[in-house]
Amino acid sequence: MTIRLPIAVRYAETDAMGVVHHSSYVVWLEAARVEWLEQIGLPYTQIEAQGLAFAVIELGLTYRNPARFGDRVEVETWLYEASSRTLRYQYRVWRGETLLAEGFTRHLCQDARGKAVRIPPNISGALAAHLRPSS
């Protein structure tokens, strides 16, 4: 499953050059990922209630075109890969038909002590049902 999360670029997200600061995209990816989980019926609060977290262990972004204050952008998000302990999400950030950025995050399932653990069947089943391995 793929979602598109709309975002209105705020002034605070821009830098001295008048474009969105590169770090703002990381915040947008997180917001889109959390929304993706909501939409598949697996809110992140439910994952945390089981004493688990999906820590970001790798992140990659390629910036194609700048976004500016006042732009309306959308973050396209999908789960690309799932293993027994890790997940990989893919993202594209759009302004209309213009691709602004594309990237990925990789996550490790951890318990409350920060130890790597297997993703429980109730979570892995929900995730697998919405896996989209091709872009």
Q: Model-predicted segments: where are they?
A:
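Catalytic strand-loop segment that frames the active site of acyl-thioester-processing enzymes
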Residues: 1-38
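HotDog/MaoC-like acyl-thioester-processing domains
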Residues: 1-5, 38, 68-72, 79-135
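Generic structural detector for well-ordered beta-strands
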Residues: 6-10, 62, 108
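A residue-level detector for short acidic-glycine micro-motifs
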Residues: 11, 63-65, 81
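Short, surface-exposed acidic-centric catalytic microdomains
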Residues: 39-45
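Short, basic/aromatic beta-hairpin or loop at an interaction surface
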Residues: 47-54
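Short structured motifs
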Residues: 57-63, 75-76, 90
